[in-house]
A protein has these predicted regions:
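Short, flexible loop/turn elements at secondary-structure junctions
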Residues: 12-13, 39, 62-64
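Conserved NAD+-utilizing ADP-ribose enzyme module
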Residues: 2-3, 49-53, 62-230
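ADP-ribose/NAD+-binding catalytic cleft of ART/PARP-like enzymes
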Residues: 1-28, 56, 222-230
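Ordered hydrophobic segments in well-structured contexts
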Residues: 5-9, 33-34, 55-57, 156-158
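Extended catalytic/binding region for NAD+/ADP-ribose chemistry, centered on the ART fold
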Residues: 24-49
Length: 230
C-alpha cells in the first residue's frame, strides 16, 4: 500500500474535519471513520435517500501508521466474520448460531483496535444475510466466500486511532447525484437477494459451521478460504 492514498467518505454532509471518537460503535469494524479508495463507491454510499449526497475527498498519509489488511492472505474469511459479529448487532436466533458466534470469537478474533487503520470488506445490510445464514448452518464457508466475491462489496478503509485522524487531510468534495447513485445502491441490494437465493439453494459439499465447531477447525486450516478480495 502506498504511503499516501486518496480516500473518500460518502455522506449527506460535507465533512471537512472528521472528529475522532464520533460515529456508530456497531459498524463493521467498530468505532471509526469509514472511507473507501473508490470515489464512485463513496457516492453510492452517500445516497441512501432521494437527497443528493457528497463524496468527501481526503489524502491519508500512512507513514508511521499501523495498518491491518483483513483482505490479505494472512487472514481468512472467518477472521473477517469474527470481527463483523463482534461489532455489528447480532442476536443469535438459534442454539447453533450462538455456539457459532462464540466459537468464531474465541478462535478467529482479530483486535482491530490495536491498529491505526483497518482495511477490509464492507458488509452492507443486503449481504449481512449471508453471514447470518452461515452462522445458522444454512450455507457453507465456501458459499459464504463465493457470495462475498460475487457481491463486489468494495473494500473500506477505516481510521481507528487519533494519529490516523491527524494524518488525514481534507482535499475537496464532489456531489453525489441521487438520481444516479440511489438506483445503483438499490440494484446492489436486489442483486444480493438474487445471489442469496441462488447460492443458498445450490448443493455444497463444503464446511458448514457445525463441521467447523465439531472438527475444532482453526485459522491455519487450508480448507478455510483466504484472501477473499481476489
Amino acid at each position: 500500500m502506498n504511503q499516501l492514498i486518496h480516500i473518500y467518505h460518502g455522506s449527506q454532509e460535507i465533512v471537512r474535519q472528521p472528529e475522532y471518537g464520533k460515529g456508530r460503535r456497531h459498524n463493521d469494524y467498530g468505532l471509526g471513520f469509514y472511507c473507501t479508495e473508490s470515489e464512485e463507491l463513496a457516492k453510492e454510499w452517500a445516497c441512501s435517500s432521494l437527497s443528493d449526497g457528497f463524496a468527501n475527498h481526503y489524502l491519508l498519509n500512512l507513514e508511521y501508521l499501523s495498518v491491518l489488511n483483513l483482505s490479505s492472505a494472512e487472514y481468512s474469511i472467518l477472521n473477517w466474520m469474527a470481527v463483523l459479529i463482534s461489532n455489528r448487532v447480532f442476536r443469535p436466533g438459534t442454539p447453533i448460531a450462538g455456539k457459532a458466534k462464540r466459537y468464531l470469537e474465541e478462535n478467529f478474533a482479530v483486535n482491530v483496535n490495536a491498529y491505526d487503520v483497518v482495511k477490509g470488506y464492507r458488509a452492507d445490510d443486503a449481504y449481512y444475510d449471508f453471514a447470518d445464514a452461515f452462522l445458522n448452518n444454512a450455507i457453507t464457508v465456501e458459499q459464504l466466500a463465493s457470495a462475498m466475491k460475487l457481491g463486489k462489496l468494495g473494500e473500506q478503509i477505516v481510521l481507528k486511532s487519533r494519529l490516523a485522524f491527524e494524518r488525514n487531510q481534507f482535499v475537496d468534495f464532489a456531489v453525489a447525484d441521487s438520481s444516479k447513485y440511489l438506483p445503483a445502491r438499490k440494484a446492489r441490494a436486489m442483486q444480493a437477494e438474487t445471489d442469496f437465493r441462488r447460492i443458498s439453494e445450490s448443493d455444497s459439499d463444503g464446511l458448514y459451521m457445525i463441521d467447523i465447531i465439531r472438527g475444532q477447525v482453526k485459522n491455519d486450516d487450508p480448507r478455510i478460504p483466504r484472501n477473499i478480495s481476489e
